[in-house]
């Protein structure tokens, strides 16, 4: 799988990550952390092992993104609570959600990590170490800012959680684009819900404002906070060779 992050509304863009060095052990994603979408040569969808109409794909992807393993991410928007009544499939044997279990990001833990890496940085004796410690430290500080902006601890998707798409070589381009659009819309709508509840603007409005005010750190922090809760990770496997049903 090649994983990319899409944060642009102008078409479908791809930026491939650099190759993984041969000496690096890449952890395998748990099955529950991957939302599988396959499209065959007849433009039919197989989602999470079952057939699905394309008009239902967006909501199915939303269910994947809001699952916590022990409940649903819900955000009060106006008089409604978005997410509270969404259905989530539970494994009857384990009692756990079949989708990713979000991990707590707690303020006390984050502050401890910040102090730890500040000490590492102060003791660093090479520029390379300083660079690496600074990068990690900045990521923990980003989490602390997100906690403060969201008003408390939050849950994030595990790093291995992603949406995986695979099409057939004979899948039509129109269907390919439709599937991509449904998946991206799922993320965008969830981001809008959270941004509206926390910051009074949709995620798209925050991005548009930041495009016109690139020096506004507050706007950037708000955008980053929303992305922390709802990252957009869409991977594309190599198309299947020849015509196959799935």
What are these regions, as identified by a protein language model?
Residues 4-246:
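Long, low-hydrophobicity, acidic/polar, solvent-exposed interaction domains
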